[in-house]
C-alpha cells in the first residue's frame, strides 16, 4: 500500500486534490462495491461501471491506478469460477492500460496508461498470473489476457520480457496460442512479434518451441503474399528470429530449408494486381531473403561461411529466377518491390563468383524476344523514371563487376559503336541489341535536346565496367563515336565525348541556377566515371590533355562558385590525376605544365582547400550520414504509399546541402576510399613536381655534344653560355617558388579555423623547404654534369689524336704491302710473256702412241668377250638338241615349232622398228 499511496500522491500533485476528489471518490465507491458487495449482481454491475468510466476518462485511469489493481488482481486470483467477474476484471485492466484518444484527452494531461503499466509490471507475480490465464478454456479470457500483455509490452517491454523468462512455461503458453482460434492466434502472433525484438534468449526458446513450422503453416493458410496483415506479422516474427542469429539461420536451412520463404515470392493469379498489403508482404519476404544473404553485420568480410552457404543454397533453389521475374519481368510490381528485389540480386552475387556466372547466363523473355538478364536490367536503368530504381539496379552491376575481371572484360568486349540512327530510336525497339551497343546508345542519347539523364546513368554503369581493369579502360579509350550530324562535326573518342557532356551539364546547371527542381547529381556521376577511368591509366590522361580546352574547362569548374562542393572536389581530384598519372614529356601537356596552370589559376592553398571542403561535405563525411537502422513497416491494413516507397529524402538531407541524397548510395565506401587515397598522392606529387621543375628535360644531351666542325674553344664557350642559362632559369624558378610560398603563407593567414591554418602553413613550409633543397641539388648536379662532360670531351679529343696517329701508321703499312703486291704482279707477267715466246719449251707426251696402245687393249677385250659368247651359244645349242629329241619322243613336230618361233621373233622385231 505504500506504493499505492505514493502513486496517489503523485496524482494529487499533478491534478490538485480538489480536481481529482470527485473521480477518486467515485472510483473508490465502485471498488468498495466490488470487493465488499454481498450480492453477485451488484458486484457485476459495479465492475461494468468501473470498466466504462476507466475506458473513457484519463482522470479515472489515474484514480484506478492508485487503489484498483489490488482489487482486480484479487478477483483474478480468487474468483476464477465467476466467469463474468473475471471477464470484467480483464476488460477493466485493459482499459486502464490503454491510452485515451488524443483527440479527447487534453494535451496537458499525464499519460495515465503509461503510469498504470509501470505500476502493474513492477510485480512479477502479476505477469505470472496473467500467463496462467492463457490456459483457461474461455475464449474471451484468453483474448483479453493477450491484449493486456501486449499493452504492457508496449509500455514496459524490459520488465515483461524478464517476467516471462522467469515464469515456467511462459513462452510455451504463448506459442500454444498460435494454434488457437484465428483471433487469438493473431493477437498471440502480434505479442510474440514485439516480444522477440532484440531479445536473444526469448528468440532461442521460441525457435525451440517450433516457431518456424508454425509461422510457415500460418502463412500458407493465409495465402502467402496475397494474405492480409497476418502474413506481415508472421514475416516480421520470422525476421526477428533470423536477424543477427547465425544459429537460427543454420537451423532453418538444415531443417525446413528455404523453399517456404522462396515460395512467398512466387506470383500467383493476376500478376498485375498488387494491393498495398501484398506489397508490404513482398517487402517483408524480401527483407527475410536479404538477412539470409547478408549474414551478421559484425562479421569480417569473406569469413562468414554461413552467409556464403545461404547464398549458394538460395541460388540452387531457383531464387534468382523468382527475383528476376519480380524485379525485371513483372511490369506492374511497385517501385519499392523492384528496388528491394534488385538489392537482393546484388547482395546475392556480391563476392560469389559462381552466382555471378549464373546471373550472366540468365536470359529473360519468350520466343524471339529473349535477351540476357543483364541487358534487361541495363534497359531498366536507362528507361526508368524512378531514381530509386536506377540506384537499386545500378547496385547489381556494381556487385557484378566488383573484383570480376572476366565479367568486366565480357561486358567491355561488346562496346562496339553502332551507326548513328537516322531517327530517334527508342532502346526498347530492339531487344537483340548487345549490352555494349545499348550502353553506348545511352551515353550518346539526349545530346540533341540536352537531356543528359540517360547519359548520366550509362556513365555510372561504365564506371563499374572499367573500375580497376586496365584492359577495359584501354578498350574503351579506343572507341570512336560518330557525330550525330556528320556534316556538323568529326568523329571523336568516347572519353572526350564524355568530357564534352560534362561541360554541357555544367553550362545547363549554370543556366538553371534559379531552378529549385531537385538536387544536382549528373555532373557528379560523370566526374565519378572520369576519376575511376583515369586511375592508373596514363593513356586516359593523355587523351584528356590532347585538347587544351579540357584543362581550361576543368580549372574553371574547380573555381566555379556556382558548382557544389562535391563537384569542385571531384574536379580537383581529376585535375590531380592529370599530374600523378602523367607520363608525357611534351611541353604544355606534362605534369609540370598542369601544376603550373593550377598555381597560376588559383594557387596551391585554394586548390588543396577543395579537398578539405569535399571531405567535410554531406556525401563524403560518415558522421553526417543518416543512421541506417532497422525500421519495420507500420502494421496497418493500408500502409501509406510514402512509407512503402521509403521516400524520406528530406529527413536524410542536411540543411544547405546541394547534392542529391541518392549520391550516398552511388558513392560507396570503395569510391570514397579511392578519393581519399588519391588526395594524399596528389599532394605529395604536386610538392615533388614544384620542387623539381622539369628536371627530366632540363639537361638536353644534344646541347652538350660538340657540333661537327666546331673547334674546342667555341665548344667551351657554348658550354659556358649553356650553364649561365641554366643558372638563370634556376634563379627564376627559385624566385617563383618563393612567391608561391608567400602566396600560401598569406592565404594561410586568412584561414578561419586554426586547423586549416596549421595545414596551410605545413604545406607552405614543406613546399618552400623542399623546393629550395631540390633546386640546390639540381644546380650542383648540373654543374657536376657539365664538368664531367667537359672532361669526357677532352679525353675523347686526346683519344682521337692517338687514333689518328695509329691510322696514319696503318695507312703506311698498307701502302708498303701494296707496293710489294705490284712487284709480285710484274714478275708474274714477265714469266707469262716468256712462256708465250717459246723460251724453255715444255716436253709433251706422244699422243699417237697412246692412242695405238689404247686401241690394242680394246681389241683384246673384244676378242675375249666374243670367245665367251661363243661358249654360251654352244651350251645353248646342246640344250636345244636335247629338248628337240625329247619333243620328238613326245610326238611333237619340232621343225614346225621352230618356224613358228622364228615368225613370232620377226614380227616382234618389226613392231619394235615401227
UniProtKB/Swiss-Prot annotation:
One of its GO terms (cellular component) is Golgi apparatus. Keywords: Coiled coil, Golgi apparatus, Phosphoprotein, Protein transport, Transport. InterPro entries: ARM-like, ARM-type_fold, Uso1_p115_C, Vesicle_P115, Vesicle_Uso1_P115_head. It holds the Pfam family Uso1_p115_C. GO terms for biological process: post-embryonic development; protein exit from endoplasmic reticulum; vesicle fusion with Golgi apparatus. It is found in: Golgi apparatus; Golgi apparatus, Golgi stack. Transmembrane segments: none annotated. Disruption phenotype: Dwarf plants and accumulation of the precursors of the two major storage proteins albumin 2S and globulin 12S in dry seeds. The keyword Transport applies. The keyword Transport applies. Residues 723-837, 863-901 form a coiled coil. The modification Phosphoserine is found at residue 911. Signal peptide: none annotated. PANTHER family: GENERAL VESICULAR TRANSPORT FACTOR P115 (PTHR10013:SF0). Golgi matrix protein playing a role in tethering of vesicles to Golgi membranes and in maintaining the overall structure of the Golgi apparatus. Functions in the anterograde transport of storage protein precursors from the endoplasmic reticulum (ER) to the Golgi complex. The C-terminal domain (689-914) is necessary and sufficient for Golgi targeting. This is Golgin candidate 6. It comes from Arabidopsis thaliana (Mouse-ear cress).
